[in-house]
Curated annotation (Swiss-Prot):
Pathway: Metabolic intermediate biosynthesis; chorismate biosynthesis; chorismate from D-erythrose 4-phosphate and phosphoenolpyruvate: step 7/7. One of its GO terms (cellular component) is cytosol. The lineage of its organism: Bacteria, Bacillati, Actinomycetota, Actinomycetes, Micrococcales. This is Chorismate synthase. One of its GO terms (biological process) is amino acid biosynthetic process. Belongs to the chorismate synthase family. Keywords: Amino-acid biosynthesis, Aromatic amino acid biosynthesis, FAD, Flavoprotein, FMN, Lyase, NADP.
Length: 399
């Protein structure tokens, strides 16, 4: 069974993650993880923090000479800004006199709308928002990307590859019918300012971000994750919590600022007649069984069908708005403007990288559940044996 956990705070010394259940033989280095974290920092409209705060990756366990050993893999993502926060965020008690004159230690008593601040203070009994925002911060996704990189490397050994891209920023969207990016397109995608596969749309997105920046606004959008090379049968129809689409939706909804998820054509199918909503099963010109389309996004009945997996996640505009929204200062009870720390105008491209990591983690878990294997070679043999034993009358290929 594959499982993982993260720990750490936004301005703490480091973020940490442990992923257990990764078979032996997966090639993974700190360089792989650092490259993924660099992708997370990409995107037009990011804030100043992306420029001066670096991710320092250290693999602490489970890997020897660039190869997993079968034990838990532990990864630390160090924070180069830690010296500035060492006293404010120290785990051990600090002399109050040392903290008194530090501006960074000022109580955050004006909770920000759209964040976890206010309800977190209620739930955990805090009189200020610092303890809440330190853990609730999207900075935590750096560890998820690290864990997802390990999972993606495992999947890559099995011929499964993932791609994420931006399909909309605010009201600017990639037109329907445009080709989907493939694994060979990742370098070009990452070179685009907004990780958009359509150049004309990307230019319009850049203009939208510029306009929002001038107006002191923030923007959201939609990202899509594609998975190529999946075998049929991951997930199950037997119970709700074993359905692959259920697990993907939960994983994507767990990303900060994500407010909606769809699989395949998702919400658009609700406006169609039944005959135009599903994927007919036919024979192609070579006589092989295929689906005539992929409106389902590669999942039917809670199981992968062998076609390209396609899921989307909708990100709301960043809640830390430069213009500062109305709130209440909980120390005085008076109306106030919310705290405004530096923020991005748009972080949708980064959300795509995080979503890609979360999808990798879900798929890696589904693969280990279905096929097992103490080594990646054993997992690959098990997949081959499974596919070889599908009866000829049921054999199919992906689109």
């Amino acid at each position: 069974m594959l499982r993982w956990l993260t720990a750490g705070e936004s301005h703490g010394p480091a973020l940490m993650g442990i992923i257990e259940g990764v078979p032996a033989g997966v090639e993974i280095t700190s360089g792989h993880i650092a490259d993924s974290l660099a992708r997370r920092r990409l995107g037009y409209g990011r804030g100043a923090r992306m420029k001066f705060e670096q991710d320092v990756v250290t693999i602490l366990g489970g890997v020897r000479h660039g190869v997993t050993q079968g034990g838990p893999v532990a990864v630390q993502v160090g924070n180069t800004e830690w010296p500035k926060w060492e006293q404010i965020m120290a785990p051990d008690p600090v002399d109050p006199e040392l903290l008194a004159d530090q501006a960074r230690n000022a109580p955050l008593t004006r909770p920000r709308p759209g964040h976890a601040d206010f309800t977190g203070m209620q739930k955990y009994g805090f009189d200020e928002a610092r303890p809440v925002l330190e853990r609730a911060s999207a900075r935590e996704t750096a560890t998820r990307v690290a864990m997802g990189t390990v999972a993606a490397q495992f999947l890559k050994h099995l011929g499964i590859e993932l791609v994420s891209h931006t399909v909309s920023i605010a009201s600017v969207s990639v037109p329907d019918g445009r080709p989907l990016p493939e694994p060979a397109d990742v370098i070009a995608l990452d070179a685009d300012p907004l990780r958009c596969f359509d150049r004309e749309t990307s230019d319009a997105m850049v203009a939208e971000v510029d306009a929002a920046h001038k107006e002191g606004e923030t923007l959201g959008g939609v990202v899509e994750v594609l998975a190529y090379g999946l075998p049929p049968g991951l997930g199950s129809y037997v119970h709700w919590d074993r359905r692959l689409d259920s697990r993907l939706a939960a994983a994507l909804m767990g990303i900060q600022a994500i407010k909606g998820v769809e699989v395949g054509d998702g919400f658009r199918t609700a406006a169609r007649r039944g005959s135009a909503a599903h994927d007919e099963i036919v024979r192609d010109e070579d006589g092989r069984i295929v689906r005539a389309s992929n409106r389902a996004g590669g999942i039917e009945g809670g199981m992968s069908i062998g076609d390209v997996l396609r899921v989307r996640a909708a990100m709301k505009p960043i809640a830390t708005v430069p213009r500062a929204l109305k709130t209440i200062d909980v120390s005085t009870g008076e109306p106030a403007k919310a705290h405004h720390q530096r923020s991005d105008v748009c972080a949708v491209p980064a959300a795509g990288v995080v979503a890609e990591a979360m999808v990798a983690l879900v798929l890696a878990e589904a693969v280990t559940e279905k096929f097992g294997g103490d080594s990646v070679a054993e997992t690959a043999r098990n997949i081959k044996g499974y596919l070889d034993n599908i009866p000829a009358s049921l054999d199919s290929i992906g689109q």
